[in-house]
UniProtKB/Swiss-Prot annotation:
Species the sequence originates in: Corynebacterium sp. (strain U-96)
Subunit note: Heterotetramer composed of subunits alpha (SoxA), beta (SoxB), gamma (SoxG) and delta (SoxD).
Domain of life per record: Bacteria
Gene Ontology terms describing biological process: tetrahydrofolate metabolic process
EC number: 1.5.3.24
Matching NCBIfam families: soxD (TIGR01374)
Protein's UniProt keywords contain Zinc: yes
Protein name (Swiss-Prot/TrEMBL): Sarcosine oxidase subunit delta
Activity control summary: Inhibited by Zn(2+), Cu(2+), Cd(2+), Hg(2+), Ag(+), p-chloromercuribenzoate (p-CMB), iodoacetamide, N-ethylmaleimide, CN(-), o-phenanthroline and sodium lauryl sulfate.
Catalysed reaction, written as an equation: sarcosine + (6S)-5,6,7,8-tetrahydrofolate + O2 = (6R)-5,10-methylene-5,6,7,8-tetrahydrofolate + glycine + H2O2; sarcosine + O2 + H2O = formaldehyde + glycine + H2O2
């Protein structure tokens, strides 16, 4: 079992959360002006970075609020969590972490 820190509720079991994809993806200003190829790239193509990655999560079994997390994709360790709308925290690769 892994505990995930909800910024609203505190640490909770991983089963209470759902993954929501990459965080901080800007919505196109005029989606109607995009070609099919550009629209598909926006919808389906995301980074698959090794290391610290910004992700969206929802606490579906608790407060039902969305938040962002910085997670190490190699170790699965959450380095930081922060509310949606807040700026991404700057971390050194050795900072933070919960397992």
């Amino acid at each position: 079992m892994m505990l995930i820190e909800c910024p609203n509720c505190g640490p909770r079991n991983e089963n209470e959360f759902k993954y929501g994809g990459e965080a901080h993806v800007a919505y196109p200003e005029d989606p109607n002006a995009l070609s099919d190829k550009e629209w598909s790239r926006y919808l389906f193509y995301r980074g698959n970075k090794k290391g610290i990655f910004a992700e969206r999560w929802v606490h579906s079994g608790g407060c039902r609020k969305w938040f962002n997390a910085l997670r190490d994709t190699v170790s699965y360790e959450f380095k930081a969590v922060y509310r949606a709308g807040e700026a991404r925290p700057q971390l050194d690769s050795t900072e933070g972490g919960t397992r």
